[in-house]
């Protein structure tokens, strides 16, 4: 008695499991938005930041997310005071008087 087996082998690859990677958060576009000596209008954003890397000086407000913004129209001034980076806005009228 003769037995004949017809065995066919096919290419096979077991499906891989799902991965938990493959996503990233959108950038928050933080940083300095206006440079030293630049003319700004009241309400312009000067610095977007997390925490207080820059501190508000004269005529600069701080938002709930630590964003610094101009309270008056004038010129931006960055300076170091007691080891802190401070951002101020010098009103346009004062700059005209100085020149």
Curated annotation (Swiss-Prot):
Pfam families: Ribosomal_L27
Free-text description of this protein's post-translational modifications in UniProt: The N-terminus is cleaved by ribosomal processing cysteine protease Prp.
Keyword set includes Ribonucleoprotein: yes
Propeptide feature ranges: 1-10
Alphabetical GO biological process terms: translation
Entry's family note: Belongs to the bacterial ribosomal protein bL27 family.
Protein name as it appears in the record: Large ribosomal subunit protein bL27
Gene behind the chain: rpmA
